[in-house]
From Swiss-Prot:
It holds the Pfam family Penicil_amidase. This is Acyl-homoserine lactone acylase QuiP. Heterodimer of an alpha subunit and a beta subunit processed from the same precursor. The gene is quiP. One of its GO terms (molecular function) is hydrolase activity, acting on carbon-nitrogen (but not peptide) bonds, in linear amides.
Amino acid sequence: MASPALRHFLPRFGAAAAAASFLSLAGCQLGGGDPETVLPASGTFPLKGLAQNVSVRRNNMGMPLIESSTYHDALFTLGYIHAGDRIGQMLGMRLLAQGRLSEMAGADALEVDRLMRSVNLKQNASDLYNAASPRLKRFFDVYARGVNAYLFRYRDKLPADVASSGYKPEYWKPEDSALIFSLLNFSLSVNLQEELSALVLAQKVGADKLAWLLPTYPDEELPFAEADKLKGLNLNNQVNDLSDLNKIALQLSDLNMLGVAASSNWAIAPQRSRSGKSLLASDMQLPAGLNSAWSFVQIRAPKYQVSGVSIAGLPLVLSGFNGKLAWSMSNVKGDNQDLFLEKIKREGNRISYMADGKWVPAASHQETFLVKGGSPIRETVYETRHGALLNASATPPGNGLSLALQVPNFKDDKSLDAFFDLSRAPNVEKAFDTSREIRAITLNMIFADASNIGWQVTGRFPNRREGQGLLPSPGWDGKYDWDGFADSMLHPYDQDPRQGWLAAANQRTIPKGYGMQLSNSWGYPERAERIAELANSGKQDLRSTVAMQYDQTTTFAAKLKTMFQAPGMSKPLKQAIDALPEADRNKAREAFTRLMAFDGKLSATSADAALYELFLQESAKQIFLDELGPETSPAWQALVANASSSYSPQADHLLGRDDSPYWDDVKTPQKEDKPAILARSLAAAVTSGDSLLGSDHKAWQWGKLHRDNWTSTSPLAKQLGGGEFNRGASPAGGDHSTLNVSGFEWGKGFDTHVAPGLRMIVDFSLVEPMTGLISTGQSGNPASPYYANSIEPWQKGQYMSIPLQQQNYEKGYGKQRLTLTPGK
């Protein structure tokens, strides 16, 4: 994404009333689809279920402002508007979470459904909903009735992704909203995919060399003791369905529009701000494409006012501003999913598993799959003491090893109530009180009021008797079992630190050796390092905060130069370059010279940024491909997948690990070392650039390699092929390590894989403190004028002010409104 033209950064009270009827027609022409499927922007319409009239206005982004005389009517209207804007997203996520996507998509989705039935988010959602207060259940019920009012009124005018599938949606239930929350929680915990990938890597290289592929953080020791758990096990032949399970988990990640565990948020204390008032910033990241699962909403009702971030299907504001308190969330990268290897004995359809020296019958229950175009399929799901056995096929697991997934249970969990209470909190102190009750999801919550800032880690973290949770543990040995959960009083927090700021960017947020285990799946440290650089550089304001959110400078480039110049590397690397054949020698020298002069700015138009990223990509191949390849192999795909979710061996080897066995190219008779492989990588970067960008190296541009592809992320649209839901591609800057995140798959390709979907800033010095923008559009319906209208403002950094004071509504939302009246 391009850096913003900062002269356009100032919040604009755009005239939202600009010809909505024309925009509806334009949306139809530009986006495809039937305008009759789009909610009207004006007029008066009766809606059965309302008690009094409700007004809905929209700003230029398409963000709705719901004004009502009762909170009941506000929730009902929110359900109606969410469905009108995002019904395809809501239905797709519900089917995915239920393990019923094949009812819409056919047999191609059956394997994902089978995995999701084993994961059993339905039980998690049931526990959460049952534990909620009667008040919260009423809220969810009213919201569901609003969704259903839309489904009834538009039953013959559903958007293209739903209508073309032939799927007939069921009405929304209150429990379905808890299911969407459970899917979000499941998606933010990346350990299932990481542990599957780690096991695939173990199959390829064995337990002895595995730890080198599982670094946890730059200053942490490699997990050799963790890898020792797998020694003596015949992983190649005994683990049931491992290759298929890993493939299905990757497919699930691709389908799940919530399935990226990345985000950034920070707060600036009054002593660090130019105005003497606090600031809060939030970058919420998701799979790149159309549309971001996040969307904006504003509600004004008696005794309740809030603007912020929502997910269609869930009547909660997850990050936002209520006039007194701003709050935001990012992924703490918490590890609360563990796989266990279970010894399995099968006798007919009966399954037993080994537990502390005894064979124990596995519990079981039946699941029925109603596959589109086929007959119903009944299968058995088996469970051990750790959880359900993950099965990739219709037949019960055979003798050998199978994988069971253990996750926390949510009985007596008050997280749903806590999120609602947080949206009403008047200050940071009250925000701490309510957020400590959020146990069902692992988050970095950052808060600010005008005078204070705070950070609180939420979630439920298992106490492991042994092991780090990086790899599946032997389930037959109780020494690896969970022993309850960490006391929430041990969860990290901070308030008004002396440094004057707080930040979370998926990095390790606790000191090495902290007293409880939050995770060993931390993200890369560079984004947090860059926040620290900028936050410490002087007084902050809205302008500097916008610049931070669009910053494309990586701190990794400077680390790379330090490595090149290290006393033990400088001379050997020069010798290794000199030893290359002449053509490669010249390329390597050019690459080295340019990288040493590179300033780390990854702008889309930069030639040196292109070379830098080519080097990162080629170095991964030069280091690992000889042992993990080819690039289509499960092991290589596992390496790439893990690098997209947490700190990677690709980065770890470049900055250190000089004694790693992977520096040797096993396909040559001689033994290579790190300088030799780095020299090859430098030359290969130029060779690859010549092939991809041409021989004029000064004309190279990072954005010609690295592009934002505006393709649909909706599970329904993906299953239908995408076509009319897509909007082409555009050059992008940045990468996984920049604050303006634009991560690609390290070892696979250059296209953007993860990017921010929504940005929010609250500057308490302003009359209207909240500004924001969304990356694509508020609506998931390609016939809507708000489907992709935000792409250009997003690329230019053109934030919109989001007014909370009633006298400013007309400036922000215009005069045009949709009026919903009580129907009969």
